[in-house]
Amino acid sequence: TAMIAFEASESEKTLQGVERLLVEMNALGMKRGSTLAAVGGGVIQDVATLASSIYMRGIPWVYAPTTMMAMLDSCIGGKSSINVTGIKNLVGNIYPPSRAIVDVTLAQSLPVEARVAGYSEAVKICFAGGPAALDRFMELVIPAEMYGNELSSRATVELTHHVLNVKKWFIEI
């Protein structure tokens, strides 16, 4: 087991960034049966998805998201994209992780803005999922927000399960 440190910035979400990761994977001796584990937010996910999908014609990968947006949305489905010649998200593919490990306790350490960004994506997913999905989202989020509190750990777990189940339904249809 080895670790590759990778900067989570738009400047690394490029073909050159993917190439750097591929070279590191090769230097570590990763083989066709190896598994890439990615821990981070959306940029890390995008680069890891593309790299694992093309390394030796595709190796399994596992994802542990660290942002609310990734926990509530992008950790399933496997959609990725990178920037090319300054054009955002020009190249991409779909290569789902073999497993997503979501630890919602990480959400408690995020700034409010980062949590709200995740909730914004979640409400969009639930709205598209229909009235029952949106009502459940509101039941989980509104009580805490009305009183200026953060979601409890239990509510965050329930919200995450709910939103990912709604998204899973979309992916499977």
Which residues does each predicted region cover?
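Active-site segments that bind and position negatively charged phosphate/pyrophosphate groups
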Residues: A144-I173
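Generic structural signal for well-ordered, non-membrane alpha-helical segments
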Residues: T14, V18, V112-Y119, G130, ...
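Structural motif
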Residues: I4, A38-V39, A64
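Glycine/serine-rich anion-binding loops at beta->alpha junctions
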Residues: M30, S34-A51
